[in-house]
Amino acid sequence: MLIAGGAVLALIGATTAGCLASTGRFPGDSMDIAWQTPPDGNKSEQGNGAWLVGDLLVRSRFDAATAYDARTGEQVWDHRPPGRSRICAAEADVDRSVLLVVRDDENRPASSRRETCTVVTAVDMENGREIWRTPIPTDTAAESGRRFERSLIAAGGGLALVADQGLRAVDVRTGESRWTAAVPGNCVPGKAAPAERHVAVLLACGAPDKPRTDGEVPEGAELHAAAFAPTTGALLWSTPLGDREPVRWDELSSIVSADPLVVSASGAGDKASGAYYSFDKDGVPRPRIDFSGDHGHLNDRLRVAVVDDTRLYALAGYYVKGGTRHRAVAFDLTTGRQVWRTDLDDLPGVALHLQDGKVTVIVKGSATSAVPDEDLYVLDAATGKERDSRSFHDAVAPAGEVFAYEDLLIVARPGASSVPAFTAYARA
């Protein structure tokens, strides 16, 4: 009887293990939903930012900025623009708990299709209340074909940068004017990212003797990275991105990190070319990190990279017989050389998070799988060695941002749709 009972128990155990294996549900190696916010509903407009500030998660989209308790997912406050106005863009100075939202005219006619982002409003991220507001002068020459793409607003280091005819800084908590940047006469400012040490800005700079209208990019302009003093707006340094070959001003570019200053740039429509360019505190260029190399090809469709004081971490694909494989890669910013690389899976990583010496990667599941099969990898930032790997019980919608809060991993969705704005996962 004991033997028969043991056989039954063994059969039950084997059957249970088989079911768990088919779904990836083993005790101690999975991620379960702890809480999620209510879905936004089916709407085509996309969100424009998500942040973790203290114990609050804040998400901005076209119709409102909303905060949720990071412990429970419960709504804490909701800030809505007045009248018919819509939020065009949003940035945050998390250290000062200030959210900056750019909106259009609240009195625009219902028939108007043109979105003019003319007002910046500062919102206290602790309670959702408006602190101050200021107009953004309308750029009457914005339809020109030679305009450098700018940040409507940027925040950080206690400053709010407003893109008007130059580059103007105000105090992020009070809105009081601080300075207007001393941009060289042959340059036009573009995207900006303020930090405590300096204000990082992309410049389109041409020959000083080339004629141009105010705000228009000079003939023959190339892309520069520049740093301005956060207290005065004085130019600290300006360095061209290219070493032997200049980088054109109209290449696809962005500031990956303000300090250390790291910039990505690639030719429009060219998936293979491009690189990350980094600079030391004095503006001396470091060796570039190419998108393509021995590490494979850094994701061109979903450019995912994070930076700490000394390294850049990214996701790459590489080709082998039978298909594409994927890995996480770390590069030394000083030398541009690969420090480590760790193979992930046959499927690409879709989100990357760096915190407390750990690199967290969410790996996309198969579109043809009958069950959710997204995976989570936690790697040691120093060595790339795997610290933890788990499977999600539920499908993970495309992630815009990933946050680690206490023992939760929180995924923010980039747009307004039928999926929740935030979902928190706990290790099970």
Language model region names:
Residues 1-10:
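N-terminal export and membrane-targeting signals
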Residues 3, 16-89, 121-124, 129-141, ...:
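Aromatic (tryptophan-biased) beta-strands that constitute blades/sheets of beta-rich domains
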Residues 389-428:
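Blade-level signature of beta-propeller repeat domains, shared across WD40, Kelch, NHL, RCC1
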